[in-house]
Amino acid sequence: MADVVLDLYAEDLDKDFAGQAQDEFGGDGVDLYDDIGGPTESAASGGGGGGTPSADGAAGPGSGEPGERNSGGPNGVYHQSSGSLTPTMNRRYQLYVGNLTWWTTDQDIANSLRDIGVSDLQEVKFFENRANGQSKGFSVISLGSESSLRAVLDQLPKKEMHGQAPVVTYPSKQALTQFESLQKTRPVPPPQQNGPPRGPAPPSMGGGPMPTGHPGGPQGGGPPGHPPRGMNSIMQPGQYRPQHMSQVPQVGGPNSGPPRMQPPMHPQGGLMGNQQPPPRYPSAQGQWPGQRPGGPRPGPPNGPPQRPMFQGGPMGMPVRGPAGPDWRRPPMHGGFPPQGPPRGLPPAPGPGGPHGAPAPHVNPAFFNQPGGPAQHPGMGGPPHGAPGPQPGMNMPPQQGMNMTPQHGPPPQFAQHGPRGPWPPPQGKPPGPFPDPQQMGPQLTEVEFEEVMSRNRTVSSSAIARAVSDAAAGEYSSAIETLVTAISLIKQSKVAHDERCKILISSLQDTLHGIEAKSYNRRERSRSRERSHRSRQRRERSTSRYRERSRERERDRDRERERDGGSYRERSRSRERERQAPDHYRDDSRSVRPRKSPEPVVAEAAEAPSSKRYYEDRERYRSSDRERRDRDRDRDRERERDRDRREEHRSRH
């Protein structure tokens, strides 16, 4: 698009830009423009500005052109209605309100509008993250009249909401893209910002077309209402693109002065003096997303306030642009060369541009990409890549620069809700950004060698002492010495060096060897203890066996003695039993008469003897049975005692 001449008053201007919309905005990670289908409005000269179709928000007429709301899309896509400037019945006046905290509600906006005298607010729609539903910090409002639109443009930036001054702009795709990029970017400035600017000063603002992405200046020759394309890589992340450049008519050649020149604005004093600083953005209560609190101050702007400048533009060269209705805003630092009027500014940064830190109302879990270099503080811009004001926006009043916001979310907004812990409104933003104070200064060669020699001494002495302690059997002392030396070397300033890593590895090898030796010694001592215990067990078992054998022998002897005594008693009883009949027989013979007695007398004499025999025999048997029972009980008791003694010995 750099070498294409555009007809500013063509009705089919959208055909020229239809093929460029996806190329320009599709790579920014913003997929909210798929439903854009409405034709763009023809740009008007003078006070009427031509808007571009916007997505996810509202149509952007330069002077409150009506926009028709389409309910399609996740956030509600707004299309611009083509037509003339004549009012219609369905006419809606819409504006973007940005730089809001994530906890700002539609009621807060309604109250602020009521305070400035606007009572015909129709709708407030916030832009939210699709992943967690959190507010992105900007919204689109619909008003009922053009007078209310003008009042909001002029007075709402002076009205703070939750400690931040809102930014009001006409709805356009460029403003929407800028709001989206500001809540996605997070620049991380290096510790020292003393480098030169990143490009030469642009030779002229009104010349012919320049190559796409040239770092020295913008492309000239584009229409006033549409900035040149293909310059996403040369714009600072925190800078806005002007929205309504059609209010600056082009008169004269490239080197001629701009028409309708206004007197320059007078400076209001430097930041270091006692006077008020020049009105610039961002404010103290509402820092722009991307500015980190506590950063370095910019250089004192001793010259007159200046307009937004390009990357690498010169300092101290103000631009006296027209002061139309869209230019009623405070100046900012940085500027263009005064050779010609600003005929076009580059668009917002593309996907390759530097990224910035999230604002307090942005969830940082979605934006962890590393940041690029920020703007030089001496170039006049806000520190750490903070954006300058956009010419299509009304800026807040004069406020300080380096104060952190002292406002937080109200109690009803739980910062640890179901959508994750939100970041606090002030302080250092979370993320994998190293602290410059923790990085440490670079060591000189002399300091490096001194630290390395100290580490070598520590390593050699630790190894020698550990080896001597290990040889003496003091393994715990040797291990402690090596561990201490390893920790000391790792904490030194040159621990990342390869030579230092070699020292650490040698110490670790020595430590592993000593630990292995200490483990082997413990195992040997344990094995000796085990062998001693097993020997004791064997001796104990042999002694038990001997005792048991002796007890068995004693038991056998007792049994033999018992058996011998019982046998003798039995033999005696048998002898008595044999002798008893003979005795009875002899008695009977001596008593018996010569005559054979009568049978009755004989039976009476024999009956007592036989009865006595059986009684004696029964008595002997019972006594023998009792004796055997006693011996059996005694043997059982002896066996029980023996078992008890065995159990007691086995336990001990």
UniProtKB/Swiss-Prot annotation:
One GO cellular component, as annotated: mRNA cleavage and polyadenylation specificity factor complex
Gene Ontology biological process: mRNA alternative polyadenylation; regulation of alternative mRNA splicing, via spliceosome
Region (Disordered): 20-85, 184-440, 518-652
UniProt entry tagged with the keyword Cell cycle: no
Comp. bias regions, Basic residues: 529-538
A matching Pfam family: RRM_1
Biased composition annotated in UniProt, kind: Gly residues: 205-223
Modified residues (Phosphoserine): S596
Biased composition (Low complexity): 391-406, 598-610
Function: May play a role in pre-mRNA 3'-processing.
Family of this protein: Belongs to the RRM CPSF6/7 family.
Name of the protein in question: Cleavage and polyadenylation specificity factor subunit 6
Record organism: Drosophila melanogaster (Fruit fly)
Gene that produces this protein: Cpsf6
